[in-house]
Regions:
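N-terminal ligand-binding/catalytic initiation module
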Residues: 1-171
Length: 171
């Protein structure tokens, strides 16, 4: 079995139920197959592909907030810091009910390549929550965002991780 196939099988085994992430990794690995196979032993020795497809950090946290009826709601928050080889993590925050760890990993993995093509010294990351801003009041959105950032700020900063807007953030 080739190194590319071994790494893809490892990704699937270590990240079950994350089909979006599997698809992104498969596409990138297939596009690199010819280059990797020409120098397979060197890349294998350096664990290049394993380092490429494994996030440096996966941060999962709860986001409690109070709705307009005074009820406490709890959403899931995520930040995947994928690769900082060329600079601080950079990537958007997505707020949508479909958000889960697999989707954030898929988007963060792709962000590595998008950011590297800018020529700027920034790495790749992505974050978000399964919070749905649709139908929420401005006060509810503010309560959620304040709670989300209160947790996330521990892991971000100009030299560490620079979040940006994405779907559901008004960006």
């Amino acid at each position: 079995m080739s190194y590319v196939d071994e790494v893809f099988d490892l990704v699937v085994a270590k990240n079950p139920a994350q089909p979006e992430f599997h698809q992104a990794v498969k596409e990138v690995l297939e596009s690199l197959r010819v280059v990797i196979e020409a120098n397979e032993e060197k890349y294998r020795k350096d664990a290049l592909l394993e380092r490429l497809v494994t996030p440096e950090r996966q941060i999962l946290f709860r986001v409690p907030w109070v709705d307009d009826k005074g009820q406490v709601q709890v959403n899931n928050g995520f930040r995947v810091q994928f690769n900082s080889a060329i600079g601080p993590y950079k990537g958007g925050l997505r707020l949508h009910p479909s958000v889960n760890l697999g989707i954030i990993k898929f988007l963060g993995f792709e962000q590595i390549f998008k950011n590297s093509l800018t020529g700027l010294p920034i790495g790749g990351g992505k974050g978000g929550s399964d919070f749905d801003p649709k139908g929420k009041s401005d006060r509810e959105i503010m309560a959620f965002c304040q709670s989300f950032i209160t947790e996330l700020y521990k892991y971000i900063g100009a030299d560490t991780d620079v979040p940006a807007g994405d779907i559901g953030t008004g960006a």
